Structures are given as structure tokens and as C-alpha cells.
């Protein structure tokens, strides 16, 4: 699986992953809205929006 693994507004980067899914996490703090992307489908804390998907580059 090829997943995006950049954060928020940094230039897009991808990673070849062993997992079959990609994720995109979104949350807000004093810096504003933070977006994190990566491989797999992690558990998240309350208040964090999580989107998991199972195709290449699906987590942009």
C-alpha cells in the first residue's frame, strides 16, 4: 500500500507501507487544525477525527 505521510500543509510525501490501509487524522489545538497522515489505522483519542481507507494514496 502507498500512503501519504505528510502533516497539515507540508509538501506531499508518500511511503510504501506493509499495512493494507492508510489513515488521516484531524484535530484542533492552539496552533489551529492539525492533519496527520500515515500507514495503518491507529486508535485515536476523543476529539480526533480519523479516516481510514484501503487503496493507494487514498488518505490525502
From Swiss-Prot:
- The organism's superkingdom is given as Eukaryota
Q: In which tissues is it expressed?
A: Expressed by the venom gland.
Q: Which PROSITE patterns match?
A: SNAKE_TOXIN
Which cysteine pairs are joined by S-S bonds? 3-22, 17-39, 41-52, 53-58
- Give any Gene Ontology cellular component: extracellular region
**Where does the protein end up?**
Secreted
Q: Which UniProt keywords apply?
A: Acetylcholine receptor inhibiting toxin, Disulfide bond, Ion channel impairing toxin, Neurotoxin, Postsynaptic neurotoxin, Secreted, Toxin
Instruction: State the Gene3D superfamilies in the record.
Output: CD59
Write one Pfam family the protein is assigned to: Toxin_cobra-type
InterPro entries assigned to the protein according to its UniProt record, in alphabetical order: Snake_3FTx (IPR003571), Snake_toxin-like_sf (IPR045860), Snake_toxin_con_site (IPR018354), Toxin_cobra-type (IPR054131)
List, in alphabetical order, the Gene Ontology terms for molecular function in this entry.
Answer: acetylcholine receptor inhibitor activity; ion channel regulator activity; toxin activity
Protein family membership: Belongs to the three-finger toxin family. Short-chain subfamily. Type I alpha-neurotoxin sub-subfamily.
Function statement: Binds to muscle nicotinic acetylcholine receptor (nAChR) and inhibit acetylcholine from binding to the receptor, thereby impairing neuromuscular transmission.
Name of this protein: Short neurotoxin 1
Give the originating organism.
Dendroaspis viridis (Western green mamba)
Amino acid at each position: 500500500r502507498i500512503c501519504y505521510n505528510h502533516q497539515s500543509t507540508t509538501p506531499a510525501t508518500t511511503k510504501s507501507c506493509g499495512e493494507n490501509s492508510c489513515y488521516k487524522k484531524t484535530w484542533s489545538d492552539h496552533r489551529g487544525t492539525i492533519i496527520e497522515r500515515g500507514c495503518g489505522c491507529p486508535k485515536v483519542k476523543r476529539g480526533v477525527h480519523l479516516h481510514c481507507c484501503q487503496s493507494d494514496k487514498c488518505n490525502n
